[in-house]
A protein has these predicted regions:
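Active-site neighborhood of phospho(di)ester-bond hydrolases with catalytic His/Asp-centered motifs
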Residues: 5-7, 28-33, 52-58, 88-93, ...
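Active-site environment of divalent metal-dependent phosphoester hydrolases
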Residues: 10-17, 35-40, 59-66, 94-99, ...
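Glycine/small-residue-rich loop that forms an oxyanion/phosphate-binding "nest" at active or ligand-binding sites
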Residues: 64-95
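Beta-strand-turn-beta hairpins that frame and shape the catalytic cleft
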Residues: 1-4, 95-110, 204-206, 262-269
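N-terminal active-site segment of His-dependent metallophosphoesterases
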Residues: 1-54, 60-69
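Binuclear metal-dependent phosphoesterase catalytic core
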Residues: 230-248, 256-328
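Charged helix-capping and loop-helix junction motifs
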Residues: 70-74, 226-235
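Active-site-proximal loop/helix segment associated with metal-binding centers of metalloenzymes
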Residues: 107-207, 213-224, 321, 326-328
Length: 328
């Protein structure tokens, strides 16, 4: 069997770059960020995917233009794409995190996941260590990666400007507050706990894990390898993967750079196949016709051609090249 995998198509930001699928019946996994709002996500999924599973990214439910909390937006997707339907929305918060691929022994375990904020790049760790030496000399408490990463996330991600959750201080349950990194960490802990349980309970199955956030620093592009923001995109879960050989593949998104790699001696597959933002020309090698061959647990592809998309890309590139000299 072949399972198609792609993510981060961002149809709202990429509205000038039309993308639709012809082979809508191919079994497909989409690890998040179809759109910047859940109604747009639902509409595109219904029109293009007739067989598969998907999860929310940080964008799909984060933007509060509907006045809904993140949870209400996930509930909206869960109602329209139930467990017993041909296309299923998965998330720990809606009580649906696992489903068997029809006619196979493959169990998909899926949820947004979020991040534990523990990962820190070697360069950033050196900077933190140097700063802590001086802090201790001044009699101050040292800083730790998790708290630094959370502070960096608040400054660097729009999630914490636009996403909302219920305000716990309001006894009537009417008020909302902005989501914060502590919420993401809490959701990560709940999701990872359930994920670990499902993996342990299904040793007899081949498991594909689907998350929006990445499970290994190998997914970080070389241009961002020293970024202070990396903990907002990845958690280092390689030991969890290698300790559980029934995890055959992990599909993810979020980082807007294509990664197809393996971890461990058993070659457990990591697949990150995001489209990213067309205006930034992030993933020029993006191919939505990317598949996991479940007989070999290797990647297979076939050529992707779209005259409408190619024409839009050419128009944008020509316009960019015409105006670029004025900004140099």
């Amino acid at each position: 069997m072949r399972i198609r995998v792609f993510s981060d198509i961002h149809i709202d930001v990429n509205s000038g770059f039309p993308f639709t699928l012809r082979d809508k019946d191919t079994f497909t996994l989409i690890p998040g960020d179809v759109s910047g709002n859940v109604k747009g996500t639902a509409k595109w999924i219904q029109a293009n995917i007739h067989n598969g599973m998907f999860i929310a990214g940080n964008h799909d439910p984060a933007y509060n233009e509907l006045g809904w909390t993140i949870q209400k937006q996930k509930d909206y997707l869960a109602e329209r794409f139930p467990l017993d339907g041909p296309v299923t929305f998965m998330d720990e918060s809606v009580g649906v995190m696992s489903k068997t691929v029809p006619g196979t022994n493959i169990l998909v375990v899926g949820s947004t996941l979020y991040t534990d904020y523990r990962y820190i790049s070697p360069f950033y760790q050196e900077c933190l260590d140097d700063g802590n030496v001086r802090r201790v000399e001044r009699g101050e408490e040292p800083l730790y990666p998790e708290e630094c990463n959370k502070a960096t996330a608040v400054r660097g991600l729009n999630d914490f400007r636009w996403g909302h959750v219920p305000d716990e201080s309001d006894e009537r349950g009417l008020k909302q507050r902005r989501v914060c990194p502590d919420d993401y960490k809490k959701w990560f802990d709940a999701t990872f706990s359930k994920m670990s349980q499902l993996v342990q309970e299904n040793k007899d199955k081949d498991i594909i894990i689907m998350s929006h956030h990445c499970p290994t620093p190998k997914c970080i592009s070389e241009r961002y390898v020293n970024s202070a923001m990396n903990a907002s995109y990845v958690s280092d879960l390689e030991k969890f993967i290698t300790d559980n050989p029934n995890i055959k593949a992990w599909v993810c998104g979020h980082v807007h750079s294509t990664t197809i790699t393996t971890v461990g001696d058993k070659g457990q597959l990591i697949v990150c196949n995001p489209r990213g933002y067309e205006r930034d020309m992030e993933c020029g090698d993006w191919n939505p016709n990317t598949y996991i061959d479940t007989d070999t647990w290797q990647i297979a592809t076939k050529p992707f051609k779209s005259k409408r998309l190619d024409a839009a890309r050419k128009k944008f590139k020509d316009s960019f090249m015409r105006w670029a000299p004025f900004f140099m």
